[in-house]
């Protein structure tokens, strides 16, 4: 009898443990596969690629790599003497054509006043046409001067906003061409998070929902709000051939990989460049309200920690 009771007890305990394990595995499966979260998230920021609008020798570099700069602070300067000479030349042309215009206007006015009684109509028309030609040349000279002035102003490269200088790869004495990127500026107060959510989890993601962000290698949890969800992603399995026909890649019907959709998350409190743009994080969407960790069960607390560091 004791042996039977012992066997029944062992069987009951085994069945109970199996049931508990099944429940735990089921809850873990739902928790990890259906709840809206991802480890594929990146800190991002607005980045300006700074390139000069003029070409020439770099005569001064006023900043260092990774320096925090203010808006309109001078970053570097390009060959000002050359552009100063070009401006002086264009100003001389303007002064010449202004004087010539005054002379031709006076001459045309005198001939028009005398009229055909003193000279032929052809001479009067010729004088008026010459005045119009000189006025046209003056306008061109003024436009050239304005462009020279603009070029001179743009020899001084300034920061378009507050931010951090990064990847500075220009040095005094180098020749830089127009439009070539010299440095990147990471705008201050522009940091956000891009979470690449699987399409199967988008049902639980809406603009305005709250989010928890855990940077990789950190136990600090940041808070944020879903700002927007991308309206589309590239279809990598469908392209066009040289004749414009659709080319669709073959796939296995029983294996379908979920597409990842970018979700932009606005941070409640920006941490400057503590987590640089491009670094990774885990993102959990908690719904309309923040998660109250004190109300979580032990299982959920453990699952959250494993998910954050997984």
Swiss-Prot record:
Compartments in which it is found: Cell inner membrane
Gene3D superfamilies: 2.40.30.170, 2.40.50.100
General function of this protein: Forms an efflux pump with AaeB.
Keywords: Cell inner membrane, Cell membrane, Membrane, Transmembrane, Transmembrane helix, Transport
GO annotation, cellular component aspect: plasma membrane
GO MF annotations, alphabetized: transmembrane transporter activity
Membrane-spanning residues: 12-32
Taxonomic source organism: Enterobacter sp. (strain 638)
Membrane topology summary: Single-pass membrane protein
Name used for this protein in its record: p-hydroxybenzoic acid efflux pump subunit AaeA
Annotated Pfam families: CusB_dom_1, HlyD_D23
Keyword Zinc assigned: no
Family: Belongs to the membrane fusion protein (MFP) (TC 8.A.1) family.
């Amino acid at each position: 009898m004791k042996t039977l009771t012992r066997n029944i007890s062992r069987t009951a305990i085994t069945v109970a443990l199996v049931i508990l394990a099944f429940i735990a595995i089921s809850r873990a499966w739902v928790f990890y596969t259906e709840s809206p979260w991802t480890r594929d998230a990146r800190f991002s920021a607005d980045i300006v690629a700074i390139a000069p609008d003029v070409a020439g020798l770099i005569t001064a570099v006023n900043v260092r790599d990774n320096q925090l700069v203010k808006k309109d602070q001078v970053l570097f300067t390009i060959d000002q003497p050359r552009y100063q000479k070009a401006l002086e030349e264009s100003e001389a042309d303007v002064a010449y054509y202004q004087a010539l215009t005054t002379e031709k206007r006076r001459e045309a006015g005198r001939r028009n006043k005398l009229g055909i009684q003193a000279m032929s109509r052809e001479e009067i028309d010729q004088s008026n046409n010459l005045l119009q030609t000189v006025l046209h040349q003056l306008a061109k000279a003024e436009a050239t001067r304005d462009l020279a002035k603009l070029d001179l102003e743009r020899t001084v490269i300034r920061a378009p906003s507050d931010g951090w200088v990064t990847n500075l790869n220009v040095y005094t004495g180098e020749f830089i061409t127009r439009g070539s990127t010299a440095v990147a500026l990471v705008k201050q107060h522009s940091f956000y998070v891009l979470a690449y959510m699987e399409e199967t989890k988008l049902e639980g993601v809406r603009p305005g929902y709250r989010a928890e962000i855990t940077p990789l290698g950190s136990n600090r949890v940041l808070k944020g709000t879903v700002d927007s969800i991308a309206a589309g992603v590239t279809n990598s399995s469908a392209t066009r051939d040289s004749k414009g026909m659709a080319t669709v890649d073959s796939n296995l019907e029983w294996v379908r990989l979920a597409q990842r959709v970018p979700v932009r998350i606005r941070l409640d409190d920006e941490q400057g460049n503590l987590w640089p743009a491009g670094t990774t994080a885990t993102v959990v969407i908690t719904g309309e309200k923040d998660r109250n960790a004190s109300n979580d069960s032990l299982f959920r607390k453990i699952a959250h920690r494993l998910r954050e560091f997984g």
